[in-house]
Amino acid sequence: QNARLVMNAEEYYRTMFQGRVSSWNLRDRHMADTLEALDAHLTGRAGKSAKIVVWEHNSHLGDARATEVADMGEWNVGQLTREHWGRRAVRLIGFSTYHGTVTAASGWDEPPQTKRVNPGLPHSYEDVFHQTGLSHFYLDLRQPGSLAAEALREGRLQRAIGVVYLPRTERQSHYFFARLSDQFDAMIHIDETHAVGPLERGGAAGDEPPETYPSGL
C-alpha cells in the first residue's frame, strides 16, 4: 500500500498541471483502489466477505454517471465501486439539507468558518424535499415500483458543499444537474442542518510549501 501511495502521489502532482478533471479522477481512483485493497485484506483475514462503511462528500460518493460531470469525463468513488462490486453489493447513501449552517472555508488553505447555508434553489432536489414539510427523513430509492424513485429520476439541480462554501456564487460554485435515483441508492434529508465543531481545538498549521512546489517543474 505504501508503494501504491507513492506511485499515485507522484502521478497526482503531475496531473495537477493538466487540469481539474485529470487530478480529480486520479484521486478518486486511488481512493477506490485503496478500498479494494482493504476489502481484499479484511476478507482474506476473516475468511468471509468484509462489510465496509466509507464516509465521503456526496460529490465523491454519488455515481458520477448520473450527473453532468460525466460529460466532462469525470468519475468518482461511487461509480468505481458500483463497477467493481456491482449494484447489489454497494449502497450509496447521500445527504441533503435545505438550509441551516455549515462549517466550511472561503478558499483552500483558509480557516474554517460557520457559514449560513442559503435556502435550496427553487425546483432543486433540496427544494423538493423541503416541500414535504418533514424535518428529516430517510428515502429508499431501490424499492421496486417506487413512485418516489421514478419521480426523482428526473434531472434536477443538486447542491454540493465541501471544504469550501461560497454562498454569493452558489449556483455557479455548488450546483449541478443530477438524476438522483440513478446517483444514489438512498437519501437522508435534514431540512435544517447545524455546523459541526471539532472535539478538540488544535493549533494552526505551520507554513507549508504549496502542493505544486517547486513551481518551476
Q: At which residue positions do the language-model features occur?
A:
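A charged, amphipathic alpha-helical module
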Residues: 1-51, 58
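Loop/turn elements at helix/coil->beta-strand transitions in domains of secreted/extracellular proteins
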Residues: 48-52, 87-90
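Generic recognition of stable, solvent-exposed alpha-helical segments in well-folded globular domains
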Residues: 7, 26-34, 56, 72-76, ...
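C-terminal regions of proteins
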Residues: 62-217
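Structural motif
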Residues: 53-55, 188
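Short beta-strand segments
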Residues: 55-56, 94
